[in-house]
Each structure stands twice: as structure tokens, then as C-alpha cells.
């Protein structure tokens, strides 16, 4: 563990080492006059009295390779800073959830043909175990409006941190399951949200955000100790069960289900890619709405894809390929999502990549 006192000691040692450099140190060893060099006896090149001692030019030193911090568990990497960072060119920015790039390669389709149905059956069997229906029932200080505000704030936060849609879905699942079993005070509700985001990122992402990043986004209203302690509490309350099926998984499954045929054309692949992109934006809107808390992720995925197909005027409806749900239940969920989209048209267009112009999507269709 690196403490403040240890850091001060290291800084003092570093300063002493720089002062005792090779250009200024004195010879401490005793030598005979015969061992002295002409430079030591002053017999070297004649010195000009008008010219002072020539000093070496100082150049800024940079590391050839940047230090990569690997220990990011529970923010351990926040304790260590790179002593001399090297100038690195900024990485190109990408649109969040930009799925308009080709996402259905031959290897992925073949893997889906081999294992897709087994993965779907397994995740479908886990839905009810991870579904937190009426999670605010025993929350006297947390209302549906507060939950909506928190998740609406987490959406741009997770985009700012370049996290995937899977992380956001898992964050909301962890948040709702914790609210279902533990009363939460209103003044620490935001801390519960960012802690859920940290746990979900560790479960899904290869480079989860740092603790100090999350605390800075909260305007440093909470301490590092509070966040780490709450992280342990959430994990204990959920019994470390974090592998919840998400809307994102079922969106990918149903989309791949459309293009598994050998006769799938490039047009069908393009339409499917656009549909799943719009469906993710619709699903993001639904995550913040407490009215969809009782619907399973697989049902939400089917309904979001149906609304997306309708908005994009596609002729390949997803419902014809899915027969696991009652028609009345699908109609009920689709009706609520249709109302949600019609009331949040501007928000939906802001959530979608820039390729989707407003004119290309018929929200009122």
C-alpha cells in the first residue's frame, strides 16, 4: 500500500538524487597526484576568462513506451501515477454504439449457427431469476422519478467513459436488484448508481473506469472509501451473482437469427444492422422508464426490434421468427414503447449515431 508518508519520502529521495548528479558530485576517494588526469590538474584546454562554465543543455526526457496500468480492480490503479508520461497521439473518437459497420462476419455467423440456440436457451432460463419487478416497492425515499433521473444521468456518463451498451444494461440490472433488497437513502442514491456502473464495467469491459473518474463525475460529493465500501455491500447483497441476461444479448441474438440463412443478401445484412442500432436507442430510452421494469429483457428486445423495423420501413418483421410470447403481451409492450418513442423523439435522435438523419426515420409510422 502506498501511503502519503511513503510518497513524501520517495519525493525527497528523488530530489536528493538529482542534486547529487554526476556533473556536480565531488570525488570522495583519496588518490595520489600521479593518478590525476590533466583535466583534474587544470592542464587541459586553456580556459577563457570571459567565458563561464559551459552547462549541458537540458532536454525533456520522455518514455519511449507509455506505462500501462493493469491493476484496475477496485481502483487500485488510482494509487499510482505515471512519473513521466510520454506524448501520445489522441485516439480517434467513435460514435457510441456505432453498429453501422459490418458486424456479421462469416466466423460470427458460423459460431451463432453452432451455439446460438444453446446460449439463447440458457439465458432465457435465467431471466426470471435476475428480474427485479417492483424494485421500488420497499423504498420510502426513492421514487420512480428519482430512478429515471439517475439512469438518465448514467446514460451520458457511460458514453463519456466509452463503455458499451452491455455495461449500461447490466448497470441498471444491478441497481434494480439492489433496490429490491436494500433500502437506500436519497442522499446516496447517486453513489449507488456509479458503484453499480463500476461493478458492471468490471464484469463486461476490458478497461473499466477508475474510481477517481467516477468520483469526479459526482463532483467529489463522495469519498473513495464510501464507494469501495458500497461496492462490497452490493456484491454481498447480490451474492456475487452478476451474470444477468440483458436486452443487449437478446437484441444481438434476434438480429443474428435473421441473417443465418446462406441466401442472406448484403441488403438484408445492412437492414438488420440498422434495425439493431435503432433498437438499442429505443431500449436505452426504456431503461430509464420504470413502466418497463416488469418486462423481461427478451420481450423488450423483440418489441424494440419491431418498433425499429416499423420506423425504418423494413419488410422483414422480427415477430414472425419469435414464438415464445403471447400476442397480447407483445401488443401491450409494443404500445408502451410506441408511446415512449413518440414522446421522446428528440432524445432518440440524439442517442443514435450521426448516420441516422432525422428524415431517415419515420417515428410516427
Swiss-Prot record:
It comes from the Eukaryota. GO terms for molecular function: cyclin-dependent protein serine/threonine kinase regulator activity. Specifically required for generation of multiciliated cells, possibly by promoting a cell cycle state compatible with centriole amplification and maturation. Acts downstream of mcidas to promote mother centriole amplification and maturation in preparation for apical docking. One of its GO terms (biological process) is cell division. It is found in: Cytoplasm. The keyword Cell cycle applies. The gene is ccno-b. Belongs to the cyclin family. The lineage of its organism: Eukaryota, Metazoa, Chordata, Craniata, Vertebrata. Residues 22-64 are annotated as: Disordered. One of its GO terms (cellular component) is cyclin-dependent protein kinase holoenzyme complex. Keywords: Cell cycle, Cell division, Cilium biogenesis/degradation, Cyclin, Cytoplasm. Pfam families: Cyclin_C, Cyclin_N. Residues 53-64 have a biased composition (Basic residues). This is Cyclin-O protein B.
Amino acid at each position: 500500500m502506498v501511503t502519503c508518508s511513503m510518497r513524501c519520502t520517495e519525493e525527497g529521495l528523488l530530489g536528493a538524487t538529482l542534486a547529487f548528479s554526476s556533473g556536480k558530485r565531488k570525488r570522495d576517494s583519496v588518490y595520489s597526484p600521479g593518478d590525476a588526469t590533466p583535466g583534474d590538474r587544470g592542464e587541459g584546454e586553456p580556459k577563457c576568462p570571459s567565458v563561464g562554465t559551459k552547462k549541458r543543455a537540458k532536454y525533456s526526457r520522455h518514455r519511449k513506451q507509455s506505462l500501462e496500468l493493469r491493476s484496475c480492480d477496485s481502483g487500485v490503479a488510482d494509487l499510482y501515477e505515471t512519473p513521466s508520461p510520454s506524448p501520445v497521439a489522441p485516439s480517434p473518437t467513435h460514435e457510441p454504439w456505432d453498429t453501422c459497420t459490418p458486424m456479421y462476419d462469416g466466423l460470427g455467423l458460423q459460431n451463432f449457427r453452432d451455439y446460438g440456440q444453446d446460449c439463447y436457451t440458457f439465458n432465457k432460463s435465467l431471466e426470471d431469476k435476475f428480474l427485479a419487478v417492483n424494485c421500488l416497492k420497499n423504498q420510502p425515499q426513492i421514487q420512480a422519478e428519482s430512478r429515471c433521473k439517475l439512469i438518465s444521468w448514467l446514460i451520458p456518463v457511460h458514453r463519456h467513459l466509452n463503455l458499451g451498451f452491455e455495461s449500461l444494461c447490466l448497470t441498471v440490472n444491478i441497481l434494480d436488484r439492489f433496490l429490491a433488497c436494500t433500502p437506500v437513502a436519497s442522499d446516496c442514491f447517486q453513489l449507488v448508481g456509479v458503484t453499480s456502473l463500476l461493478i458492471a464495467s468490471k464484469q463486461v469491459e476490458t478497461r473499466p473506469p477508475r474510481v477517481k473518474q467516477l468520483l469526479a463525475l459526482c463532483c467529489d460529493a463522495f469519498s473513495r472509501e464510501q464507494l469501495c465500501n458500497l461496492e462490497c455491500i452490493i456484491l454481498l447483497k447480490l451474492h456475487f451473482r452478476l451474470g444477468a441476461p440483458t436486452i443487449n444479448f437478446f437484441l444481438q441474438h434476434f438480429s443474428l437469427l435473421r441473417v443465418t440463412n446462406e441466401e442472406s443478401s448484403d441488403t438484408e445484412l445492412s437492414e438488420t444492422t440498422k434495425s439493431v442500432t435503432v433498437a438499442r436507442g429505443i431500449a436505452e430510452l426504456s431503461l430509464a422508464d420504470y413502466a418497463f421494469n416488469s418486462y423481461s429483457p427478451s420481450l423488450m428486445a423483440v418489441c424494440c426490434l419491431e418498433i425499429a423495423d416499423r420506423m425504418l420501413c423494413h419488410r422483414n418483421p422480427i415477430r414472425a421468427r419469435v414464438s415464445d410470447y403471447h400476442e397480447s403481451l407483445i401488443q401491450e409492450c409494443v404500445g408502451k414503447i410506441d408511446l415512449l418513442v413518440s414522446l421522446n423523439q428528440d432524445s432518440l435522435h440524439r442517442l443514435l449515431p450521426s448516420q441516422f438523419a432525422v428524415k431517415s426515420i419515420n417515428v410516427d409510422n
